[in-house]
Regions:
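Substrate-binding pocket helix/loop in short-chain dehydrogenase/reductase
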Residues: 57-58, 62-70, 152, 163
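Short, small/polar-rich loop/turn modules that mediate ligand/substrate recognition or access, typified
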Residues: 133, 138, 193-195
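The beta1-alpha1 cofactor-binding region of Rossmann-like NAD(H)/NADP(H)-dependent oxidoreductases
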Residues: 20-31, 63, 176-177
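Short C-terminal tail/terminal secondary-structure segment
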Residues: 106-109, 183, 194-208
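Residue(s) in the substrate-gating loop at a strand-loop-helix junction
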Residues: 101
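Active-site helix of classical SDR
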Residues: 81, 117
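Alpha-helical segment proximal to the catalytic Tyr-Lys
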Residues: 86, 130-131, 191
Length: 208
């Protein structure tokens, strides 16, 4: 799948580098960033998009199930952002976007670990946004609802149909619709938007 995406992007004339790394490990994340910078130059735009689930009700949840999700989903924001933030501050420009989740806003049965990690991502966003604004760096969150990703499509079809029935627009989201929101925040015209959380969920959650 990764190779297909790389070929598609390269076909559009974009230079692409893929680097393996464990975003849950600070040393590995730093090495990953250095490898990218050596091949492509400084990182000006960072999308923190790591996400796993280890679903179970809290009274059955093991410490490992909790820690794995928090480490991958939330700690990765620190691990990957820390190596790039100084360069962004020095260059007086940057875009940092966290991909959180509707379940970080409304909670979800059996996902105390996942919901906590995704809610924490926006807490990270609004704090870093305050620290970084004067350096020309915007920091925002995108909180998708149920999108037809590999993770969601692995859910049994009858369950997916029940989920879609709860969405006012009547369907799951498409990955391109989330990418469009990310591209919006990256755009120079969005330079006055920072600390925001953009909900993209087909109307399933309308908190404000």
């Amino acid at each position: 799948m990764r190779a297909v995406v790389v070929r598609e992007v390269q076909a559009r004339g974009v230079n692409v580098v893929t680097v393996k790394g464990d975003v849950g490990d600070p040393g590995s994340a730093e090495a990953m960033v250095k490898a990218v910078e050596q091949q492509l130059g400084p990182v000006d735009i960072l999308i923190n998009n790591a996400g796993i689930t280890r679903d179970t009700t809290f009274h059955k949840m093991s410490a490992m199930q909790w820690q794995d999700v928090i480490n991958t989903n939330l700690n990765s924001c620190f691990n990957v952002t820390r190596p790039v933030i100084d360069g962004m501050r020095n260059r007086k420009w940057g875009r940092i976007i966290q991909i959180a989740s509707i379940n970080g806003q409304k909670g979800q049965y059996g996902q105390a670990n996942y919901a906590a990690s995704k809610a924490g991502m926006h807490g990270f966003t609004i704090s870093l946004a305050q620290e970084s604004a004067k350096f020309g760096i915007t920091v925002n969150t995108v909180s998708p609802g149920y999108v037809a990703t590999e993770m969601v499509m692995a859910v049994p079809e009858d369950v997916r149909n029940k989920i879609a029935a709860q969405i006012p627009v009547g369907r799951l989201g498409e990955p391109d619709e989330i990418a469009y929101a990310v591209a919006f925040f990256v755009n120079e015209e969005a330079r006055w938007i920072t600390g925001a959380n953009l909900s993209i969920n087909g109307g399933q959650y309308m908190g404000w």
